[in-house]
Amino acid sequence: MATIFSRIIAGEIPCYKVADNEKFFAFLDINPLVKGHTLVVPKQEVDYIFDLSDEDLAAMHVFAKKVALAVGKAFPCKKVGEAVLGLEVPHAHIHLIPMQNEKDMFFSNPKLKLTDEEFKAVAEAIRAAF
């Protein structure tokens, strides 16, 4: 059975897409810690990020870097943090989170509740920053 991320990539479930290429897909986290919280996933369905080939793992991080630079331009911050957890969804993914301080990376923090229009504006701001 396809993961929720595979269904998002296939267009079966809507998302706020930020970027993609032939191997990777970036979209806004639907339960963001802060505005600009973005997920980067491989289009190949792989549960554990370290099960990716060395080539694909490196390419995923290069793609994530491009997305992170756009996130940082769209949402000025001290740094864009990167986290790999992967326990909730069995599909490898990288969280990119604009940070003013390390507390912005605490996944136990309350999640933002954004409207559809706010999500669209966030995604557009990141896309425009590429």
Describe these PLM feature segments.
Residues M1-F130:
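HIT superfamily nucleotide-processing domains
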